[in-house]
Amino acid sequence: MPQTLPSAVPTPAEIAEALSRRILGQEEAVREISVALSKQLAGLRVGNILMIGSSGTGKTTLMRAVEGYLASDPVLVARSAVVRIHANVLGEEAERGRPGEVVLGRLLERAREQLGPSAPVDMLLRRAASGLVFVDEVDKIRSHVGGQSNVAGIRAQEALLTLIENEAVPLTLPAWAGGASVVVNSSDLLFVCAGAFEGLYDSVFDRVTIGRDRGALQPVTVVEGGKVAEKLVFHLRDWLRNEDLFDYGMSPQFLSRFDAVVLLQDLGQDELVRIFLETPESAFHQSRGYFESRGIHLAISPNAVRRIATEAGRQPRLGARALKEVFRRVIRDYEFDPTRSITGGALLIDLPEVEAVLGKA
């Protein structure tokens, strides 16, 4: 008979709505994560996800948003332990001959934090075995770098494979849990692996323009500035194939364990503006908190925000991180002397103040 979902399990749409308050402009990634998380919370088997996106496009922010979402609901906290780990750590553990122990150990500790120190060890192990594992910078465990074999990367991929597909992973329990050696079925873990995959964009572009698929990408006619011209329009999502990831250094066995490969989009000006104004972690909101602590209300005009976003957009490989660097240049003198240009207890940053630092667009 079909399995009936517990009534408390949120739908993918409900999860996506909550995550979208923290992560902007990455609808596909949010949808994939939301579906996978809803299934896992219901106790269903779910496929793993590989996220590819330039620095600053929101990979880590999305991971943190999921953690925050689960932590905000006591019912959900009791159903899923979540850990984040750097991919290279898996390689280091594999070299010590205990692949997977660090991940399962952290999940066990996380489950204990959530369920309390008096929770039975068997219950904690069950929670850990159905946890959510975010693996950051997974592109750093490629099998080769600069034409040279990367032994640590190979071992890390093998260690991650062991966790993803193995139903019998050995784990030595910590002292507080008795210190015994147990075997954990890790096949119910949900893995979300993410990386920037620097150089992948260029290698795929070369493949379809000057490489083995030369001519596959054809120029299109566009009108720019009132002039008709031919232009190559390239989007990685349209041309990325598994063999491109193989060539990058991710093994076929490793990639076959991911049901979805999600490409995060580089952020446009509209997304950068929203991130700057709407996300609580933005440089603007952090600076506003600083000024409020001194009794000053910080405001910024729409034109000034647009100019900052335009400048940040010139560094597409940095994504939203470029906003922090650009805004820092604008605001640092005001933060040094908070009383500068104050009118009626407020500081307004307008376009002239921004252009005085950045120049005209």
Identify the residue ranges that each predicted region occupies:
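Interdomain "pre-motor" coupling segment immediately N-terminal to P-loop NTPase/helicase cores
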Residues: 1-9
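Hydrophobic positions in the central parallel beta-sheet of the AAA+
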Residues: 83, 133-136, 262
